From Swiss-Prot:
Belongs to the universal ribosomal protein uL18 family. This is Large ribosomal subunit protein uL18. It comes from Macaca fascicularis. Signal peptide: none annotated. It is found in: Cytoplasm; Nucleus, Nucleolus. The gene is RPL5. The modification Phosphoserine is found at S185, S272. Residues 253-297 are annotated as: Disordered.
Length: 297
């Protein structure tokens, strides 16, 4: 079919329909959302859960949500900016941090539903493929589906780091190893050791060592926060191991106590009826006294 110029006449503008607001803003892929949200018709009121992963400049957001007419309902959430509590104070947007955030989300969710002792997940990090299976006589494994949003789902994307963390944490999420670091598209083989290195932050540690040898100034600029927090390349693996253990030990979100704000009054409060009557009586008495003094003088 050849090129056809769109004639923007009166009929075009009269029949024009704007796209959904979030499509206009470039925030939602409705083609993908439709397939992630619509539940099987034989499951009736059962929600279809999604694991939402969003990577920002300074944070990684992981949420478990399901769709309702009123809007998406968030069941549980975990954020990378909460990782300093577990000992990870630097590199909060790298692959290792994404894994930790996914792990925190999974353990927090299972703890909320009382399933954390039933589904421990994979405690020792190997980087290899692992799938959670339901245990007979126990509640079924919590199943959800990855929602990567508008992120480009290339091999090694941090979104899949969060996915791996959630799966190792005990959630059942359909996936394959094709998008994990360590998968070779030419040989069609997956190297679990390469994936484990990324989970343990060894790719960052190797780059730190390289910069320390090659360019000291670039190292100080690139890893200023690591230097400030005294994090060396040799400490990285142990730091993440301790973080994984700490997350499993206490994944519960602690609510901050509400600050009591003392209300300030900037205008005078209204007087009650009794106060108004009393004020009038005082003014009358004052006026009468003034009249009496004037008469005496």
């Amino acid at each position: 079919m050849g090129f056809v110029k769109v004639v923007k006449n009166k009929a075009y503008f009269k029949r024009y329909q704007v796209k959904f607001r979030r499509r206009r803003e470039g925030k939602t892929d409705y083609y993908a959302r439709k397939r992630l949200v619509i539940q099987d018709k034989n499951k009736y009121n059962t929600p279809k859960y999604r694991m939402i992963v969003r990577v920002t400049n300074r944070d990684i957001i992981c949420q478990i949500a399901y769709a309702r007419i009123e809007g998406d309902m968030i069941v549980c959430a975990a954020y990378a900016h909460k990782l300093p509590k577990y000992g990870v104070k630097v590199g909060l947007t790298n692959y290792a941090a994404a894994y930790c955030t996914g792990l925190l989300l999974a353990r927090r969710l299972l703890n909320r539903f009382g399933m954390d002792k039933i589904y421990e997940g994979q405690v020792e990090v190997t980087g290899d493929e692992y799938n959670v299976e339901s245990i007979d006589g126990q509640p079924g494994a919590f199943t959800c589906y990855l929602d990567a949003g508008l992120a480009r789902t290339t091999t090694g994307n941090k979104v899949f780091g969060a996915l791996k963390g959630a799966v190792d944490g005990g959630l059942s999420i359909p996936h394959s190893t094709k998008r994990f670091p360590g998968y070779d598209s030419e040989s069609k083989e997956f190297n679990a050791e390469v994936h484990r290195k990324h989970i343990m932050g060894q790719n960052v540690a190797d780059y730190m060592r390289y910069l320390m040898e090659e360019d000291e100034d670039a190292y100080k600029k690139q890893f200023s926060q690591y230097i400030k927090n005294s994090v060396t390349p040799d400490m990285m693996e142990e730091m993440y191991k301790k973080a994984h253990a700490a997350i499993r030990e206490n994944p519960v979100y602690e609510k901050k106590p509400k600050k009591e704000v003392k209300k300030k009054r900037w205008n005078r409060p209204k007087m009650s009826l009794a106060q108004k009557k009393d004020r009038v009586a005082q003014k009358k008495a004052s006026f009468l006294r003034a009249q009496e003094r004037a008469a005496e003088s």
